[in-house]
Structures are given as structure tokens and as C-alpha cells.
């Protein structure tokens, strides 16, 4: 595993990182959510988290970040040591050359700190996915492996008509299926599995490790930590309501806890129920640490990316703080970034 020195690892050698979807709390604006992202990134940097990845979603009332590449620059500028990247860029929407140019620029500005996580999912509904296409008369072509190969070539050597080599970010393949594991293994790429989407992915990670000579595995989980198990479960009501609504075809801002509890009660949803096909780790610091270690062991992962969605930003900060303290991670010295003239 690449050692970027951003945190001291736990006894089980698990690196901790952040996955941020820039959730929009009810009563706040998308701009507020994006400013929360920068604030949380600075806090995560001070706590010693290894990476800060920004997710891509389109047409969602609950998630503010449609362009991770736009947020990576401000986040990297506002932090000192933490690696910053996309979690991920949904490559089928874009030109590989444009993605290479964008992330090559970011890597030049913040050398040694930029990650390019690549995904294949639409990140939105079919209707919005169509709106993202430049030529809407044609059905999108599913040529993801070819796109990924072209993208990597831009970081390898100069090509005809492109007289320079882009500065290279660290490229990761993201996924939640067996196919993504196959591609990651074939291409020899680091692989991050979205357990928060598909908690049955241990076999995919096992395949990847068994077929990739230099495997590097991370797992992204949903987690909420508080001082007590009961308080963490209470805070999780917001994301559980949002998921119930999402599964019904409605994207809503993250509701306040009291509103979410009332909704779940009216709908007859048990207090601890998570929608089928999802897993949310909740609990006190000790409980969450045990769950994280168990999931990391399931996946054979040396790194865990933590996604925390709650209504109150202070509670979200506190969740990451409690987890960092429980694992005993500490910030390292700053990595040089954009020089000031």
C-alpha cells in the first residue's frame, strides 16, 4: 500500500479516510452544504484522516456536489496534508481527455495530494443522465473500459497532438459490483468498494485481491458515531428517513432528527431499521471501531472511507472526531501544496 504519511495507523493497520457527498440539511442551501464540506475537510485534516474524497451526484435535492473537480481545488487549498480527490468522477458522462486535463492541472497545483477516483455509475436518474449528454439524439455508448484505458494513457506518455505529459494523480477504480473488481484487477488499479451501497461485496474484494498482483483495497462505509449507542441511533434517523424516501423515488434534503423520528414512527418503520440492501454503522466510539475493524477484515481492506450523513453539521464533525480519537490517529506534518507568490 502506498504510504503517504497522513496518519498514524491503528494496531490493525487500518487507514481512515473521509467520503463526503456534501449532504444538504433541510433548512439550508446547497451553498451551505459546500461550505460545510470545506469546513469538514479542514477538520479531518487536523484530525489526521488520510484522504478526503468528494462524490458526484446530479439532480439530487439532498446532495450538493455535482462536480467533484470544482470542489477539489478549494478543499486542497484549505487543507495542509490530507489527500484530496474524487469519489468519484462518473467517467461515462465525460471526455477522458478533459478529465485528464482537469486532474493533471490539480496534480500540478497540489503535487502528491490528488486522487482520481473513477466510477461507471450514472450518479443520477436516467432522465438527468440523458440531459448530461452533449448529443441527446444518440443512446449513450457503454465503452467504459475503453474510456478508462484512454484516460490512463494520457498520464503515461505524450500522445500525437498533445506535446506534454499530464501530471498524474493517483488513479483508483470505484465500484459496488463484481464487474468493477474484474476491471480493477485486470488493469492493476487500486480498488475502492462502496459497501454503503452494496454490503455484500466481500467476495468482489476477494476476487480483486486474488487476481491483482499489487492489490490495494479500500472500503467505503456509512457510519455515525456519538458518545452513546442510543444517541448515534437517534442521529441516524435523518439518513434513514432520507433513504426510505429515496427508495420511493423522492430525493429530499436531510431532515432534522425530530422530523425524521416522527416520519419513521408514522410509517411504522422500526427505530433501528435500515432499508434493505444498505448498512449503516452506528454506535459509541468503541462500537463503531469494532464494526469498522470487522468490515475491513471482511474486505481485506487496509483503508476505510467513512461517509457520515446527519442533519447537524456539528454532530457530523463530532462523529469523525470520536472515530479518530478511538483509533488513535494523529495528523502528520504538512505536505507542500500550491506555493504562494
What is the meaning of each model-derived region?
Residues 1-82:
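N-terminal beta1-alpha1-beta2 module of alpha/beta enzyme domains
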Residues 4-6, 130, 136-161, 201-301, ...:
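An alpha-helical appendage that flanks or caps ligand/catalytic pockets
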Residues 11, 45, 72-80, 103, ...:
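Acidic (Asp/Glu)-rich catalytic clusters
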Residues 13-30, 92-156:
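Flexible, glycine-rich active-site loops centered on histidine and acidic residues
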Residues 16, 44, 48, 56, ...:
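Conserved, mostly hydrophobic/aromatic
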Residues 16-20, 52-54, 84-86, 114-118, ...:
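Hydrophobic faces of well-ordered beta-strands that scaffold small-molecule active sites
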Residues 20-35, 89-96, 167-175, 276-284:
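Active-site mouth loops of central-metabolism enzymes
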Residues 179-197:
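A conserved active-site cap/scaffold subdomain adjacent to cofactor or substrate pockets
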Amino acid at each position: 500500500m502506498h504510504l503517504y504519511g497522513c496518519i498514524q495507523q491503528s494496531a490493525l493497520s487500518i487507514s481512515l479516510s473521509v467520503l463526503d457527498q456534501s449532504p444538504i440539511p433541510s433548512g439550508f442551501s446547497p451553498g451551505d452544504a459546500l461550505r460545510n464540506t470545506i469546513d469538514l475537510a479542514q477538520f479531518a485534516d487536523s484530525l489526521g484522516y488520510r484522504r478526503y474524497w468528494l462524490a458526484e451526484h446530479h439532480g439530487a435535492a439532498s446532495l450538493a456536489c455535482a462536480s467533484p473537480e470544482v470542489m477539489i481545488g478549494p478543499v486542497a487549498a484549505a487543507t495542509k496534508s490530507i489527500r484530496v480527490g474524487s469519489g468519484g468522477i462518473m467517467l461515462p458522462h465525460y471526455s477522458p481527455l478533459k478529465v485528464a486535463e482537469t486532474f493533471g492541472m490539480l496534480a500540478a497545483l497540489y503535487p502528491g495530494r490528488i486522487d482520481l477516483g473513477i466510477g461507471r455509475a450514472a450518479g443520477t436518474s436516467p432522465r438527468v443522465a440523458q440531459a448530461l449528454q452533449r448529443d441527446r439524439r444518440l443512446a449513450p455508448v457503454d465503452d467504459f473500459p475503453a474510456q478508462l484505458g484512454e484516460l490512463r494513457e494520457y498520464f503515461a506518455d505524450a500522445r500525437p497532438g498533445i506535446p506534454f505529459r499530464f501530471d498524474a494523480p493517483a488513479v483508483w477504480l470505484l465500484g459496488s459490483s463484481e464487474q468493477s473488481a474484474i476491471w480493477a484487477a485486470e488493469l492493476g488499479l487500486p480498488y475502492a468498494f462502496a459497501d454503503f451501497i452494496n454490503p455484500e461485496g466481500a467476495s468482489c474484494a476477494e476476487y480483486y485481491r486474488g487476481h491483482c498482483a499489487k492489490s490495494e483495497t479500500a472500503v467505503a462505509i456509512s457510519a455515525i458515531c456519538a458518545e452513546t449507542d442510543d444517541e448515534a441511533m437517534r442521529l441516524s434517523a435523518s439518513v434513514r428517513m432520507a433513504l426510505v424516501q429515496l427508495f420511493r423515488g423522492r430525493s429530499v434534503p436531510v431532515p432534522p432528527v425530530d422530523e425524521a423520528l416522527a416520519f419513521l414512527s408514522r410509517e411504522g418503520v422500526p427505530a433501528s431499521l435500515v432499508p434493505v440492501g444498505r448498512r449503516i454503522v452506528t454506535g459509541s466510539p468503541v462500537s463503531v471501531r469494532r464494526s469498522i475493524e470487522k468490515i475491513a477484515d471482511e474486505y481485506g481492506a487496509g483503508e476505510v472511507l467513512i461517509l457520515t450523513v446527519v442533519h447537524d453539521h456539528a454532530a457530523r464533525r463530532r462523529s469523525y472526531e470520536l472515530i479518530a480519537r478511538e483509533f488513535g490517529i494523529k495528523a502528520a506534518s504538512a505536505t507542500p501544496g500550491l506555493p504562494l507568490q
